[in-house]
Every structure is written in C-alpha cells, then in structure tokens.
C-alpha cells in the first residue's frame, strides 16, 4: 500500500505541475525506437511528404485524387497510420468504425519505396511496436468488403428488382439502381407513382412542388410482353387496375423542368470546398451553396465554413477555439486569394460574389487535449472512511470555473464512485468539500448550498479537493461489508467491501451471489472453478460474536433471513485441486516483474495449471492477482487507471506490449518458461 500511495501521489503532483503537457498515446511505440526530432512540433522547419491512397469498397475502386500528408522523415506508428486510414474512409466513403467491425474484410496495404509491402487488418486492433519513416512510403491501398447478412440474401430471393432510368431536361442517368418489390406482388399505379416520386427526390432532388411546376413529368412502364404504359406524374388520376411486379421489365422516368424568367434571379451558385484536418485532406466532393443572395459578407461566409466543419468533420466552435491553426483560404477566379482566421471576430465590410469564387480550402490543426483539459485529484470520505487519490476531476475548456461548476463535478463523482445521489446528499448530516489551493489557502463549500459567485477560479491554482459526507438515517440505504479472499492459502488484504442493501432482510442465497461475483471479478474464479474446487466456503462474522460457515458448492440454503447491518465481515476461502507434486513443481515458474521500474515489490513466482501451454490472458490474470495480493492494486483500480500496460520479454529476444485493461482473444499459446521478464507500467 505504501508503494501504491507513492505512485498515486507522485503522479498526481506530476499532472498538476505539468498542466498543458502533451502525453503521447503511443509511448509503447516510442520506447522501441529513438525519438525522431523531425516529428517534434517545436521543429518548424520541416517539409511535407504526400502519400497517395486509393479506396476500394466491394470491388469498386476510387481514383487516387487525394493524399495523406505527413512531415518529411517523420517516424509514425501503425496505430497513428490506422487512425489516418479510418479518417479518410469515414470522410471519403462514409464508412464508420461500426461498419468496419461488421465488414467481411477490412485491410490496407502499405507499399514501400524499396519494393516491399505490409498488409494490416483494420479489424484486428493489434499493433506492432515498430515505427515507419514517412519518406519510405510509396502508396497506400485501402480495401473494404462489407458483410452481407444471411437475412439480406433471403430478402434478395423473395424480392424482385426493377431497373429504372431518370432523364431530367434531356440528361439521362445510367441504370445503377432498382425499385424493389415483393415477387409476384400486385400493386396499384398509385403505389408505383409514390415509389417513382421517392427516387426522383432521393436521386435527383426533384420534389412534388418541382413536378407541379415542371413542363412535363411522366414515367413509362415497359412490360415483359412488349407493351408499355405512359403515366403523367402531374395528373393525380389513377386507374383501378393492378400490376403484377414480376411482369415489369423496366421503368423510364422523364422530367422537363419549367424555367420561369423569375427563376434566373434564383440561381443557385455552388462553390467547391476541401477540408484539411491535421494534415489529412478530403476530396472536393461537396459545395457551399449560395442561393437567392449570391452577394455575401465574410462574416456569413465564416458561419457557413464553421457549419460544414461541424457537419463533415465534427469540429465544433469549442474545438476551433483551442485549435493551433484554424483558417480558410478563398481562391478567386482572377487568380487572387484571401486568408481568413476562423477564430477572428474582425471582418471587413467588403462583399464577395459567389460566382467570383473558384474554391475554398479549410485548414484546421487541433490543439492537444492536454491544453484544453485540466485534472484535479480528489478524495472521498463517507462516514469517516476515505479512499486514496486514484482519480481526478476533469475540467474541459475554459481554464476558469466557479464553485457551482465544481459542485456539479463533486456530485457526479459521488454518484459514480460511491453511489450517493442527490436525495442521499439532501438528507446527509454533513456534505461538504474542501478546495485546497497551491498557495496554501483552502475553502470549505457546502454541497447542498446554492452558491452565487462572481469571481471565478483558475483550475491550475487548485491543488486537490477533499469530499466529506456523513449520511443521515434516510441516506443509509446500503451497507458496506469488508471481506477477504484466500485462494490456496494466499489471502488478500481488506481493500474492498461488499455493497448490500439495507432496505430488506437478506438470505444466504443473496449473499452467495455477491460472494461469487467478487470471486469472479477479483480472482477470476468462475462457477465452474468452484464446482471442481477441493473446498469453497465463506464465513460470515456477526457483530454479536456469532459466525456462520456457508458452503459455496451447495445449492441448499437455510430459510433464515438477517440484516446486512448485523454483519461484521466475511472471509472467503477457496482451495483448488492440484494435479501432483511433480506437476506442481514444473508449473511453478519464476521470472522478474517490475512496476514502474521498481523491483521486488510483487511476487516473481507464478503457478500455472499447465506452464507449457499458456496464453496472454493467463499471464495477465496472474499479474493482476500478484498486484492485488502484494500491493493492493485491484482490478477496479486498473480500470480507473489512465494507463495500465505491461511489456513481456521472451528469451528468444522478442517482446510484446499488452493492455491490462483489455481482455485479449488471442488463443496463441507459449511456454511460461520462455518468459524472460515483465515490466508493468501504471499511471493513475
């Protein structure tokens, strides 16, 4: 526990002392190779390298019109490269992370200038620690095959597809789509007309109003027997005849829009634009629309730019406020150009005509989250029981806050961490928090008070926040009972508590479920493991001095009920079968383990069921158990950690990074005796 306090205190002070520091998410990759100074944001003299890419979706390829932009000779990880690839898939083809997970295949191929290539699976989520030099990349090909569900195939068999063409003002569209009907379905001309109008609106943007104002609007139904029928879309008159969908060969839709003289004044001017976000550019596939009023000022133009940034790339006004760069360049047809800052409030009185604009390029380079986000460590004491500083309050955006804002944050963590809601606080005997400032002063605030404060505080001036709650009688809806777990004679200290309801009397069946739950979450012991265990029991110690031993393997429970408030503590004891002394000896494996480079603070001897065949998950479970037993770092603590990874070194010279917060589905096995050492890195 001393080590755990040392880690958390050191890291908490480190976070406060370095507000605005940029933590690299790819520290694992950076550890593998020396840092490339050319990629530093402080080195402004770098040049750019453009890597062309192509996207193929379901066999249909897109021309190489755009490039990924990197700093020249920059060393990047495969994780960073995958993020870039996913970004262009989303912006160019509308393929999201969910689409990739559900796809039949999703991969990209990196072609290097030395003739080699590397294929990366976009669905794997596993990255090597190797770095790539951007100047060595020749091109990138992205290939995605979307998954077609079995249900869709059944629908295809049951559905009947009718090809259609659309001709608007003499311009025809190729037969790329079909109208879908049920096979041998009898439909009316009214239903058919509704389908035709629907595709006119979705494919060509022609509404009912446009059809009424058009010179001509009709569609021709071509039947398989050689006959055809022409229907006027403007008439609104339908015959009572029904058509069998399987008799239709094709449908030709023809619309001539009426051009009134007054429509000349309502011309819709389209200006193409592109967005470059953090060096990744999108194709010019969209336009800014200027209708009715082609003359516009730069203030309105800036508003339109911000709107497309929000719509196309999810960049809000808040993101722009903290961006390193945020500007757009207006290129005119006469060869001139004008650069305008998106965060500026100063606009010229000049007007610009949309027809004079050739294109608009939008450039945004977002700032690091560390500059926008600030973290303040906090502790919670409920009825005198305090928690260590393992978490921080996160303040995003404005560096100044009021006590009203802090109170909202405090209420949120009380609800999340300790299950204390607004109602419990209302009836609490005491509900306060103390703000400790770096200058040595402090201020105590009542959580239940309505604070109206004119002066704002700077988050960076706050050292820590201590929350203190003493619940009243109405707030005591739950009891927290301390427990210990002993597996094969090895016990853990009392770090956690069982949360048991006080609202009603409980049974041993209810208590059994609670005990099994913590065995599963804390030590990875499932119901099946308990069934085959040599011994599985727990002892309930009551405050009146009595105790009750309960067999976890039995499904027979006494009908007695009791109150959780009468329980003093619970000791859980599980003994598992071992194969033989000979096997046990060979399954005991020793290798050094460090935590944040500290040695000999956790056990270096581990017992595996079969040391000759273990997986990464098996190793992770053993390391978590050792940290819980020796240092009191539980699975819950790891889940709240900012970073929890370990690097396993093998005797053959290879190594692998593993995230302790993730459950791996890698079924590849290896020998425990092949492990040379393990380095664990924790950041709270």
From Swiss-Prot:
Pfam families: MAP. It is found in: Cell membrane. Disulfide bonds: none annotated. One of its GO terms (cellular component) is plasma membrane. Its main location: membrane. Keywords: Cell membrane, Membrane, Repeat, Signal. MAP repeats lie at residues 45-154, 156-265, 266-374, 375-474, 475-584, 586-684. Gene3D superfamilies: 3.10.20.120. It is a peripheral membrane protein. Coiled coil: none annotated. Residues 1-30 form the signal peptide. It comes from the Bacteria. InterPro entries: MAP_dom. Binds various plasma and ECM-proteins. This is 77 kDa membrane protein. It comes from Staphylococcus aureus (strain COL).
């Amino acid at each position: 526990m001393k080590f755990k306090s040392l880690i958390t205190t050191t890291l908490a002070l480190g976070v406060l002392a370095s507000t605005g520091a940029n933590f690299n998410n790819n520290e694992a990759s950076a550890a593998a190779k020396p840092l490339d100074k050319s990629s530093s944001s402080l080195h402004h003299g770098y040049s750019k390298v453009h890597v062309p890419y192509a996207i193929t979706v379901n066999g249909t390829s897109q021309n190489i019109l755009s490039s990924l932009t990197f700093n020249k000779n920059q060393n990047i990880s495969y994780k960073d490269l995958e993020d870039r690839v996913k970004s262009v898939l989303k912006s160019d083809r509308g393929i999201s992370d969910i689409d990739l997970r559900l796809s039949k295949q999703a991969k990209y191929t990196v072609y290097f200038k030395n003739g080699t290539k590397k294929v990366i699976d976009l669905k794997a989520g596993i990255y090597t620690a190797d770095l790539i030099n951007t100047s060595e990349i020749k091109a990138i090909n992205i290939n995605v095959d979307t998954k077609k569900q079995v249900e869709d195939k059944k629908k295809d068999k049951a559905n009947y597809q009718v090809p259609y063409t659309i001709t608007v003002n003499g311009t025809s569209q190729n037969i790329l789509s079909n109208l879908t009907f049920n096979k041998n379905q009898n439909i009316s001309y009214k239903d058919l007309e509704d389908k035709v109008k629907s595709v006119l609106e979705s494919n060509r943007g022609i509404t009912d109003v446009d059809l009424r104002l058009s010179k001509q609007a009709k569609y021709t139904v071509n039947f398989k027997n050689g006959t055809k029928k022409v229907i006027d879309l403007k008439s609104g008159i339908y015959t009572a005849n029904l058509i069998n969908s399987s008799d239709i060969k094709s449908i030709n839709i023809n619309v001539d829009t009426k051009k009134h003289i007054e429509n000349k004044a309502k011309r819709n001017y389209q200006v193409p634009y592109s967005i470059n976000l953090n060096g990744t550019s999108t194709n010019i596939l969209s336009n800014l629309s200027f209708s009715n009023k082609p003359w516009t000022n730069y203030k309105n133009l800036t508003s339109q730019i911000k709107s497309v940034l929000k719509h196309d790339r999810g960049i809000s006004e808040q993101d722009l406020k903290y961006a390193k760069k945020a500007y757009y360049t207006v290129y005119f047809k006469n060869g001139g150009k004008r650069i305008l800052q998106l965060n500026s409030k100063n606009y010229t009185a000049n007007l610009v005509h949309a027809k004079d604009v050739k294109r608009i390029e939008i450039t945004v380079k977002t700032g690091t989250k560390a500059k926008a986000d600030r973290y303040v460590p906090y502790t919670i004491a409920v009825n005198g029981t305090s928690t260590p500083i393992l978490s921080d309050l996160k303040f995003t955006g404005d560096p100044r806050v009021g006590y009203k804002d802090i109170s909202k944050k405090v209420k949120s963590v009380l609800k999340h961490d300790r299950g204390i809601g607004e109602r419990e606080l209302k009836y609490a005997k005491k509900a306060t928090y103390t703000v400790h400032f770096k200058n040595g002063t402090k201020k105590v605030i009542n959580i239940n008070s309505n604070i109206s404060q004119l002066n704002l505080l700077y988050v960076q001036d706050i050292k820590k926040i201590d929350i203190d709650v003493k619940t009243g009688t109405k707030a005591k809806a739950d009891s927290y009972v301390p427990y210990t777990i002993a597996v094969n004679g090895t016990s853990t200290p009392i770090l956690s508590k069982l949360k048991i309801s006080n609202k009603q009397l409980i049974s041993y069946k209810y208590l059994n479920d609670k005990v099994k739950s913590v065995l599963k979450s804390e030590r990875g012991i499932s119901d099946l493991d308990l069934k085959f265990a040599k011994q599985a029991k727990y002892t309930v110690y009551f405050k009146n001095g009595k105790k009750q031993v309960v067999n976890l393997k039995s499904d027979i429970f006494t009908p007695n009920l009791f109150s959780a408030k009468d329980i003093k503590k619970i000791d859980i004891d599980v003994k598992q079968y071992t194969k033989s002394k000979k096997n046990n000896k060979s399954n005991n494996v020793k290798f050094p383990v460090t935590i944040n480079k500290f040695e000999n603070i956790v056990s270096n001897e581990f017992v595996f069921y079969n040391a000759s065949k273990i997986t990464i998950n098996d190793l992770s479970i053993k390391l978590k158990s050792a940290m819980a037993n020796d240092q009191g770092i539980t699975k819950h603590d790891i889940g709240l950690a900012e970073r929890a990874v370990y690097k396993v070194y093998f005797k053959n010279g290879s190594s692998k990074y593993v995230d302790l917060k993730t459950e791996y589905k890698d079924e590849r096995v290896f020998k425990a005796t092949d492990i040379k050492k393990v380095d664990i890195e924790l950041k709270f």
